[in-house]
Amino acid sequence: DSLKVPTVFHLAQEKGLVTAATPWPVSVNGPFDYLIPEIEPVWDEKESTLELVRQHDQPPMMIEYFAFFSDLNSSEESTQGFQRDLNLHHIFKTVFRKSLPHLTGYHIFRPDDAQHTHGRRHDRVREAFLFADSLVGAVIDLITELNQWPHTTLIVTGDHGHVDHHTDIRLNALLHEKGLLTVGNGGITNWKAVAHPSGGAAFIHLKNPSDDSERQNVVSLLENKEWGQLIEGSDLPETLKGYGESDFVLLAEDGYNFSGDLDQPFVYPHSGGGHGGDPNNPQLKTTLFAMGRGIRSGAI
């Protein structure tokens, strides 16, 4: 229900094509013949990522199949770090080799994880990209081994870049402090105003948008801050809207990141990398490489 329009995977399924995602974002209950969903616990840190995946993989018991018939590491620890990508790479190669899906989505995690932790430029980030490069090289080798280049288009791309930050702004902690929302059992229990942070931006919703006094209260609290630019939701271009219609949008200034944490202090020193902000920011640009069937060398 998070998807508002058909994806390319829906269109492929409608044509009777075989689809795979090993893994792919927003894929639970999606149009896939083979699926390792990209999913992890949100609220309960003790909940098992592996168990969540087992509930939604396709065909059912696919994780068990790989754990039993191959050297797949199926421990909870294997859902993080380099081992996660190695496991998913093994699954991707096996599915591709045995089934040759018409359309496959395959996501490598480490570059994003490393940049969130260390920022854009760090030895660990370079290490993560070299690791990802080796996995892409193995995909190219597999397509070559199976003589599939006459039938295969390979696209290597990202969905965003990263922006360095030195400070987290915990907006909902601020709204809680000012009496605009209540917190209990680690979550938000009620609210007059609430923020949906996405790193480089935050979408502010009012429970009663027609309450001019409450609206002005929020404006006074959030405008003219060194850490963010407040924009009326109605003034935002359609291409920059998220989380449905929002009453206000905050765009993070350089060096700041909007976090979902509820703990004080609401201004929290924290270095790393983030995204989710204005896509016109050059640092959020990513790359795209394509090769194979239908791709002309050097063409843009």
Task: Report the location of each language-model feature.
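Secreted, luminal/periplasmic, and some membrane-associated catalytic domains
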Residues: 1, 5, 10, 32, ...
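His/Asp/Glu-rich, glycine-adjacent segments
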Residues: 1-119, 214, 223, 259
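Structural recognition of the beta-strand scaffold that forms the well-ordered cores
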Residues: 18-23, 103-107, 154-156, 203-205, ...
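C-terminal accessory region downstream of the catalytic core in glycan-modifying enzymes
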Residues: 24-26, 220-221, 283-300
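Flexible glycine/proline-enriched surface loops and loop-helix/loop-strand junctions
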Residues: 73-77, 120-122, 186-187, 197-203, ...
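Short glycine/proline-enriched loop/turn "hinge" motifs that connect secondary-structure elements
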Residues: 96-98, 196, 277-283
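Active-site-proximal segments of metal-dependent phosphoesterases and phosphodiesterases across multiple
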Residues: 115-133
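C-terminal, low-complexity/hydrophilic appendages and adjacent surface loops
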Residues: 255-295
